[in-house]
């Protein structure tokens, strides 16, 4: 429930669920009824989003449908001779740019333009969506 139905609309839901499971293991029943009730109430009241689940399923489907290769500028460049293969050439390190974001191609040519993670307007995902819009609007 915490990941499948709530996801990043409330990222704390997974923390609450994990903490509740650990507490139940340590405390035992019948005292754990209150722990479980608290966690269940939190999950019931949390904003919901299945965007993260949809994203991984869409990405896995894309991998099954399309044979791709990693863009050459993203390929490993931590060995001698990588330059001859073009590996790492032209790579832009995001943390060297404003807002730690840089426009560059990350997806293989074969699936360039596909979008897997569609943020919702629910809970924290709305803030993530606004953040992504801001950094893209202000990228070099």
Place the predicted regions along the sequence by residue.
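Terminal-proximal interaction/regulatory segments of ATP-powered molecular machines
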Residues: 1-101, 108-140
């Amino acid at each position: 429930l915490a990941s499948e139905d709530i996801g990043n609309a409330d990222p704390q839901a997974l923390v609450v669920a994990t903490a509740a499971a650990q507490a139940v293991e340590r405390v035992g029943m019948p005292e754990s009824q209150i722990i479980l009730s608290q966690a269940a109430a939190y999950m019931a009241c949390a904003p919901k989003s299945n965007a993260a689940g949809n994203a991984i399923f869409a990405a896995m489907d894309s991998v099954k449908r399309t044979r791709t290769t990693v863009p050459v500028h993203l390929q490993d460049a931590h060995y001698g001779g990588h330059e001859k293969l073009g590996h790492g050439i032209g790579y832009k390190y995001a943390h060297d740019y404003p807002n730690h974001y840089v426009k560059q191609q990350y997806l293989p040519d074969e699936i360039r333009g596909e979008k897997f993670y569609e943020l919702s307007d629910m809970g924290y995902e709305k803030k993530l969506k606004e953040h992504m819009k801001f950094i893209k609007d202000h990228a070099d």
